[in-house]
C-alpha cells in the first residue's frame, strides 16, 4: 500500500505540489486572502465559506490562521471532497452542491458569512453563470463581509507582456514535467484513479463531468470588477497580483 491510500495529508501534499507548478507564489496569494479576512472581522472568530473548496486547501490555511473560525466547504467533486473530509474532520462542515445552479445556497448551514473565499476554480463557469453567482454571493455575506476570488485574471493593460509571461511559465512547467520533478494535472488524477480508496470516487467524478470541465474562461481583472460592481457590492478591487494571476475582493 502507498502512503496516499492511508494518509490524506499525503494527498494534500501532492495536490499542493501539483498546483504550485502552475502558481509558484500560491502561498503568498493565500496570505493576501487571509489578510483580507482579518481586515473585516475586528478580532472575532470568522464564519468563512470556502467556495469550490476541493481538497480543503483554503479551509486548512484559514483554520491555521484563525483556529476558532467556523468553516463551510462547498464543492461537487466526490474525490476532492473525500480528501477534504478526511483532512478537516469535524473542523468544517462539508457540503456537496453544484455551483452551476442557484439552488446551491439551500445546502448551506448558515444564512450569512463574514467571508467567502475561492481560488483557481470559478474559471470553469460560463460568463453568464459567473455573473449570477457573484450576485448570489453578495446575498450570503453579512453587511461589511468580503468575497475574494483568486484565479487566472490577465492584466488587460499589458496584453502582450502577459501573454509572454504565460508562455514562459508554461515552458518552465513543461520542462519540470518532462524531467519528472512535478506531477501534471492529468498525472495527479491518474494516480488518484489508481488508488483503491479514491478510484471509485474518481470514476463517479467522470459521471459528473463526462467530458471534463467546460472550457476554461479567463477574463481580465476588469471583467471581474465590472461584474462584481453590477452584482451590487459596495467596494471592488484587486488585493493581490502575481504575473497573470490575481485576487479580486468585493465588500458587501
Regions picked out by a protein language model, each given a short descriptive name:
Residues 117:
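A conserved beta-strand element that flanks and buttresses the S-adenosyl-L-methionine
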Residues 120-124:
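Short catalytic micro-motifs in class I SAM-dependent methyltransferases
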Residues 231-252:
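Core SAM-dependent methyltransferase catalytic element
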Residues 131-143:
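A short glycine-rich, Lys/Arg-flanked "PGG" loop and its adjoining helix->strand segment in the class I
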Residues 1-43, 57-61, 148-184:
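Conserved class I S-adenosyl-L-methionine
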Residues 215-231:
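Short alpha-helix
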Residues 49, 56-104:
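Class I SAM-dependent methyltransferase SAM/SAH-binding core
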